[in-house]
Amino acid sequence: MKMYDLPDKRGHFGPYGGTFVAETLISALDELCKQYEYYRGDAEFQTEFFRELKHYVGRPSPIYHARRWSDHLGGAQILLKREDLNHTGAHKINNTVGQALLARRMGKSRIIAETGAGQHGVASATVAARYGMECVVYMGSEDVKRQATNVYRMKLLGATVIPVDSGSRTLKDALNEAMRDWVTNVGNTYYIIGTVAGPHPYPMMVRDFQAVIGNEARQQMQEEYGRQPDALIACVGGGSNAIGLFYPYIGEENVRMIGVEAAGKGIDTQKHAATLVTGRPGVLHGNRTYLIQDENGQIIETHSISAGLDYPGVGPEHAWLKDCGRAEYVAITDGEALAAFHALCRFEGIMPALESSHALAYAAKLAPTLRKDQLLLVNLSGRGDKDMATVAQQSGISL
């Protein structure tokens, strides 16, 4: 692949991305673009960002060889990039630290966020507490029920959690409400989008803050294995953990990049969230990307056992990587993800998030088809504490 320098100045990844928002937000986004372009090249900002990642988040996150599970499956060796070990338990904190530091430099006193699984909400509430800022988190009321523990964590951290009862009452609807808040309070408010979606510059900005995952992985693989992995595997909802791992590898065409979406009850049903596998291009939440929509262009309600993958869109960079053939996208069902969740618990003593379990499930399918000396690097994007009630319920156990 020739030198990769996307997005362009207007935020496009080929035909995807861009800025499709109300006129009232254009000046706020222009200002954000200007400020981010300045600070991404500012040595002092970058030094503070990486210092926070080291001393507050606990980076670098290690790469762990899941030896027992690999032996059990046969075939390729499965390696895990342990984002679950970060402060707050997932990759989301990488991005919220970066955006909160930017918000402070822009003179904002209030941050807002949307959240699905609650991890981005917790990470946003965490940095708000760290930097002494007001925090409001929008969350679909369906997700509030599914993720009661994370809701309480956000409140403990001082955030106000606002349940959203419109639409499917999930991440899509929370994002809509957060956008409305931002339009109204743009003077003192910074909107921390949690994934690589939304209007420009968010897909680029979130990618840049999450690229620490892939940059660390490249160095760690070279030091520990003397080479890079044969394939990268990461779950994809909006796609920030995946793009964080993939981005530094885009130019290495001998490394496969595999994004794993939620097939829910099956992609032949209406109960899934496999946007890139089944969707087609359209505009949602400020950018052009693949969407799950009906023949009239109306968004179809999605389903996944994991709240963080339950989204009808996807980051525009993933849409571009799919179209140009650099990345592959597959889908894993609720049942397959649950089986992988239990397997990692039993074989490695590691409890993965249900989102990450989708990536693990595909690794478990792929590994036996490959040689023993081949390496699969899976992004273990988060830990599974938040999913205890869901997993127990699936096993017929009431907590």
From Swiss-Prot:
Chemical reaction(s) catalysed? (1S,2R)-1-C-(indol-3-yl)glycerol 3-phosphate + L-serine = D-glyceraldehyde 3-phosphate + L-tryptophan + H2O
Pfam families named in the record: PALP
Cite the GO molecular-function annotations of the record.
tryptophan synthase activity
Q: Which InterPro entries did the record assign?
A: Trp_synth_b_CS (IPR006653), Trp_synth_beta (IPR006654), Trp_synth_beta/beta-like (IPR023026), TrpB-like_PALP (IPR001926), TrpB-like_PALP_sf (IPR036052)
Tell me where in this chain the PTM N6-(pyridoxal phosphate)lysine is found: K92
UniProt keyword terms in alphabetical order: Amino-acid biosynthesis, Aromatic amino acid biosynthesis, Lyase, Pyridoxal phosphate, Tryptophan biosynthesis
Q: In which pathway does it act?
A: Amino-acid biosynthesis; L-tryptophan biosynthesis; L-tryptophan from chorismate: step 5/5
Domain of life of the native organism? Bacteria
Entry-linked PANTHER family = TRYPTOPHAN SYNTHASE (PTHR48077:SF3), TRYPTOPHAN SYNTHASE-RELATED (PTHR48077)
**Similarity comment:** Belongs to the TrpB family.
Q: How does it assemble?
A: Tetramer of two alpha and two beta chains.
Record-linked NCBIfam families: trpB
Please give the function described in this protein's UniProt entry. Answer: The beta subunit is responsible for the synthesis of L-tryptophan from indole and L-serine.
Q: What is this protein called?
A: Tryptophan synthase beta chain
Q: Which organism is it from?
A: Nitrosomonas eutropha (strain DSM 101675 / C91 / Nm57)
Q: What is the gene name?
A: trpB
